[in-house]
Every structure is written in structure tokens, then in C-alpha cells.
Amino acid sequence: MDFDYTVTTEKSFDEAVKAVEQETKTAGFRVLYIHDVSATLKEKDFEIKPFKIIEICNAKSAHTILQADIKIGLCLPCKINVYVKDEKTYISGMKPIVLSRFFPKANLGNLPTEVDAIIRGIIDRSK
């Protein structure tokens, strides 16, 4: 099983980032922070193509997951990456369903599957 869900988009990099921001809000999640990785690396004289990490969260889901196992906080908040590779723009997110593999003793119920569907929806509607 792949740990990520990745799509290409015909949108520009900036349009894709804006779309993810909007679709995140529409899905009932919140954008916590956007890391401009390419700008951060450029400050240290390292060049990469445009790359942003968009941290997103739903407080209710996060609370439930952290109650099951506080160590799952290592995987929070959820992240959606937007990047350019080979002249194409990609939107990518980690599949929350993999959390059960990383934390097999945590009783997460259907929540990882539910959040997985929401994140896939955000990505699909953003492309």
C-alpha cells in the first residue's frame, strides 16, 4: 500500500496552493501554516523548484487521535504538499490510513479512513 495520494494538475503552482487552501476550509479543516520550503532553502543558497507544505487540521479528529495515542502527534498536523517536478505541478498528501500500521496498538476505529477520504477529496477538488 502506498503511503501517499498524489495527483497532477493543470493549474499553476500558485493556483494549486490557493485551491488547496480553499478546499481545506470547505472540508471543515483549517490551514494552520504554509511552509515555503523552496524559499527557506533559497535563503541558505539551495535551489529547488517550487515546493510548499500546507499544514491542515480538524480539531475534533486531532483530539480523538491524540486520545488514542499521544505519539501519533508525530504525524500531525496532516500535510498536503504542492510542488513542481519535471515541469508539472503535483498535489500530494499522506494517507491517514497508514497510521494504523505505525501505531498498531492505538484503537483508531474508522477515523483514519474517514480523514483519508476527506484529504483525498481536498486534493481531488484542488486539481
Language-model features and meaning:
Residues K79-P104:
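Beta-strand/loop substructures that line and gate deep hydrophobic ligand-binding cavities in soluble
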Residues K18-A19, D36, A68, I118:
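Short Gly/charged-rich anion-binding patches and loops
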Residues T24, C75-K88, I123-K127:
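Short secondary-structure transition/capping segments
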Residues M1-V31, D124:
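Terminal, regulation- and interaction-focused segments at domain boundaries
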Residues A16, H63, S100-F102:
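Intrinsically disordered, low-complexity acidic/polar segments
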Residues F102-K127:
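Well-ordered alpha/beta subsegment
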Residues L32-N81:
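Compact, glycine-rich, soluble single-domain proteins
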